[in-house]
Regions:
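Ubiquitin-like/PB1-type beta-grasp interaction modules and other compact soluble beta-rich domains
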Residues: 1-65
Length: 66
């Protein structure tokens, strides 16, 4: 299936979950925020949130500061 990841087409297996996408993108151990179709997906749901063809996914890195 195809999704859009930060505006770029990305191919994943059917039934892939957010955690798999993060692994493919090399971000599995990073502090990131994930948004799917304008809804934030909490880290606690990364392993269970199933992606669908055509989903628009945005991933942003958490940056500390003050």
């Amino acid at each position: 299936m195809n999704i859009l990841l930060n505006g770029i087409a990305q191919e994943l297996r059917d039934g892939a979950v957010v955690a798999e996408l993060l692994m493919v993108a090399g971000l599995a151990e990073k502090r990131v925020a994930v948004e799917v179709n304008l809804d934030i997906v909490p880290r606690s749901r990364h392993a269970t949130h199933v992606l669908c063809a055509g989903d628009r996914v945005e991933i942003v890195h958490a940056i500390g500061g003050g």
